[in-house]
UniProtKB/Swiss-Prot annotation:
It catalyses: a ubiquinone + NADH + 5 H(+)(in) = a ubiquinol + NAD(+) + 4 H(+)(out). One of its GO terms (molecular function) is NADH dehydrogenase (ubiquinone) activity. Pfam families: Oxidored_q4. It is found in: Mitochondrion membrane. Its EC number is 7.1.1.2. Belongs to the complex I subunit 3 family. The chain crosses the membrane at residues 6-26, 57-77, 86-106. Keywords: Electron transport, Membrane, Mitochondrion, NAD, Respiratory chain, Translocase, Transmembrane, Transmembrane helix, Transport, Ubiquinone. InterPro entries: NADH_UbQ/plastoQ_OxRdtase_su3, NDAH_ubi_oxred_su3_sf. Its main location: mitochondrion. GO terms for cellular component: mitochondrial membrane; NADH dehydrogenase complex. It is a multi-pass membrane protein. This is NADH-ubiquinone oxidoreductase chain 3.
Length: 137
């Protein structure tokens, strides 16, 4: 057998061994809340899993994926820059321009603004602006 085959076999055996050890020695405390649906920013209680939630979390995730794909698609250009010449540069700049226009559009529509559920009450304070409030902290 070659060294690469032995390496893959060894890593697979070690991974399965660690999974088996974890299965044996890890604490197991099942209860209903662990199996309930979890969404960041929302608390699920027993019997109340059908709560409404905003689509903004999914939009935020999609924007992250698009920008991540932008990095993945521009990386080959950076690696093979000496082969691409000016034609590849024009295509890359057009691609980045399209992604940037979409990102600016989403910023303009406030699609990336996620409302915080933690409200700071400033009723007993008499500050005219947020900057004045933060300056007192």
């Amino acid at each position: 057998m070659s060294s690469m085959t032995l390496f893959i076999l060894f890593v697979s055996i070690i991974a399965l061994l660690f999974l088996f050890i974890n299965l044996i020695f890890a604490p197991h405390n099942p209860y209903q809340e662990k199996y309930s649906i979890f969404e960041c920013g929302f608390h699920s209680f027993l019997g109340q899993n059908r709560t409404q939630f905003g689509v903004k979390f999914f939009i935020f995730a999609l924007v992250y994926l698009l920008l991540d794909l932008e990095i993945l698609l521009t990386f080959p250009f950076a690696v093979s820059e000496y082969v691409n010449n000016i034609y590849g540069l024009i295509i890359l700049l057009g691609f980045i321009t399209i992604i940037t226009i979409g990102f600016v559009y989403e910023l303009g529509k406030s699609a990336l603004k996620i409302d915080s559920r933690q409200v700071i009450t400033m009723t007993r304070f008499n500050y005219s602006s947020t900057i004045e409030y933060l300056g007192k902290i």
